[in-house]
Amino acid sequence: MQTSDRDLSGPEASPSGMPEVLSECPPAPTKSAAFDLFNLVLSYKRLEIYLEPLKDAGDGVRYLLRWQMPLCSLLTCLGLNILFLTLNEGAWYSMGALMISVPALLGYLQEVCRGQLPESELMRRKYHSIRQEDLQRVRLSRVHLSRPEAVAEVKSFLIQLEAFLARLCYTCESAYRVLHWENPVVSSQFYGALLGMVCMLYLLPLCWVLALLNSTLFLGNGDFFRVVCEYRACLQRRMNPRQEECACESSALQGAGGRGLLDSSPAPTPTEDLTPGSVEEAEEAEPDEEFKDAIEETHLVVLEDEEGTPCPAEDELTLQDNGFLSKNEVLRSKVSRLTERLRKRYPTNNFGNCAGCAATFSVLKKRRSCSNCGNSFCSRCCSFKVPRSSMGATAPEAQRETVCVCASCNQTLSK
């Protein structure tokens, strides 16, 4: 105590020295506000809920401008143009006052009616509203959320923030490109549109400017032209249903022709092709019963052997060059000549021997001709069945129908 009294009685304790000591002391550090990232997420979610009506209004405007429902978009465009062109200045002021007073009146009535509701009804409205529940969950989420859930909420917010900033940066970069004339075409269009709007505002009344702007927004986008093209195609289909049927049939025929070309063998055909595939195609191309019977009587489809005399090309050239013969007549002539050759080469009697086992043909042992090589065999030696498509037939039925061949031809065709 003595020492303290002595110190106080010294020259340092003079009243004139006290302010100097106080002024020399450093100020106490103020406590800085801590940054809480989860509070930022909470505020963002609340703001998102409060701004939802504006988001819904924007979605409705985009829905109309994209012509998702063409009738509503057309009626909206026409209605706005009529309003812009018919309302005068007084009507516009009246409409503005109405747009301000109606929401105010609705909010006031809602608040007045809410005060008269019982407590149970207020609680029911509070806890059965989806958005109120979401807001309540957001407010209480910090207390009940675990650490992983909180981290997930923060990550979701950061992802949305990054996407928003990326869009904003892209918009700013696009604006700078236009202002710095990096793309002369876009910049000239932008400045030309601005000059055109200034001229329109100077030359035309405001109502006409608004009507032109509204028509440009509705009728100048790509969705409007898409809807017009769809309706035009639908109208053409209704006006010409036969054309559509013909187009479907032609597409089906083209598809069948493409499959036939894929199934056909690449081997070149001679001037007059007597292969089994060509004979079957001729039968399918000409459904005349007379020529079908002529082919079915023989039950044979043969190839030209090496020592056989080929058909002279003059007949084929004559048939092709003669303009008075139709395609059906050409096919009839080819089938008739083929049938006659088969009848001359393979008689209908059962005399002779089997080329495989040398057995004599009789009433009990019928002769059978190989559909590939054309030689005569007994029923035992010519009992192998192969599909007609393996011999070059390109018809769709050739994949299912089978013909009888000998053992050697079966080995050759099976490879």
Swiss-Prot record:
Region of interest (Sufficient for localization to endoplasmic reticulum tubular network and for interactions with REEP1, REEP5, ATL1, ATL2, ATL3 and SPAST), residue spans: 1-210
Post-translational modification: Phosphorylated. Phosphorylation is induced by NGF through the MAPK/ERK pathway and modulates interaction with RAB11A.
Main location: membrane
Region feature (Necessary for interaction with VAPA): 290-296
Compositional bias ranges of the Acidic residues kind: 280-290
Binding site for Zn(2+) 1: C354, C357, C378, C381
Family annotation (CDD domains): FYVE_protrudin
Pfam families: FYVE
Sorted UniProt keywords: Cell membrane, Cell projection, Endoplasmic reticulum, Endosome, Membrane, Metal-binding, Phosphoprotein, Transmembrane, Transmembrane helix, Zinc, Zinc-finger
Protein localization: Recycling endosome membrane; Endoplasmic reticulum membrane; Cell projection, Growth cone membrane
Residues annotated to bind Zn(2+) 2: C370, C373, C406, C409
Keyword Flavoprotein applies: no
SMART domains from the UniProt entry: FYVE
Start and end residues, zinc fingers (FYVE-type): 348-414
Region Sufficient for homooligomerization, residue ranges: 1-92
Region (Disordered): 1-24, 254-290
Domain of life of the source: Eukaryota
Molecular-function annotations in GO: identical protein binding; zinc ion binding
Protein function: Key regulator of RAB11-dependent vesicular trafficking during neurite extension through polarized membrane transport. Promotes axonal elongation and contributes to the establishment of neuronal cell polarity. Involved in nerve growth factor-induced neurite formation in VAPA-dependent manner. Contributes to both the formation and stabilization of the tubular ER network. Involved in ER morphogenesis by regulating the sheet-to-tubule balance and possibly the density of tubule interconnections.
Entry protein name: Protrudin
Organism: Mus musculus
Lineage, broadest ranks: Eukaryota, Metazoa, Chordata, Craniata, Vertebrata
